[in-house]
Amino acid sequence: MKYHDGKDRCSWANPKNPIYIDYHDKEWGVPVYDDHKLFEMLILELFQAGLSWECVLNKREAFREAFDDFDVYKVSAYDEEKQAQLKENKGIIRNQRKISAAVSNATIFMKIQEQYGTFSEYLWKFTDHKIIHEMGKTSSELSDQVSKDLKKRGMKFVGTTIIYSYLQAVGVVESHEEGCFLYHKE
């Protein structure tokens, strides 16, 4: 699909939303190795469950402010009072179960960092540090494995579909559509 700038993009990239276009062009499918960014995306994907990714992206800056710039240490220490404040924040998705999951997932994220040195090392070990090229899926054997392991560790809102979306977002799985200017063959 041609956009106003003459570039073809993936069909899901809403041409009327510059935030979405920027995300598609500069972030989605780009390999991420930085734990801070990996944590941010994990939290955003958690809040996306049952909603559109575009909705979450439109609220991203409010999430960033509300969640202390996605500082995993600060988020892991959120008490009931801070969680109640988040529940009242109209700039974010105010779902108590998701807010609680973000806090408990932060603690588990740090435990994984302790075990593997970085969360990045943990995540990329599932593919032997290789990018997987596949399109047209909402889950895979890989997302099943990662989801199962994260659930075993106690994380919430990490089902296989959410994890597949996360893997695409952080570039472990590259899924740009054929015809998209960012499409790469294996």
List the model feature ranges, each with a label.
Residues 1-186:
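HhH-family (HhH-GPD) DNA N-glycosylase catalytic core used in base-excision repair
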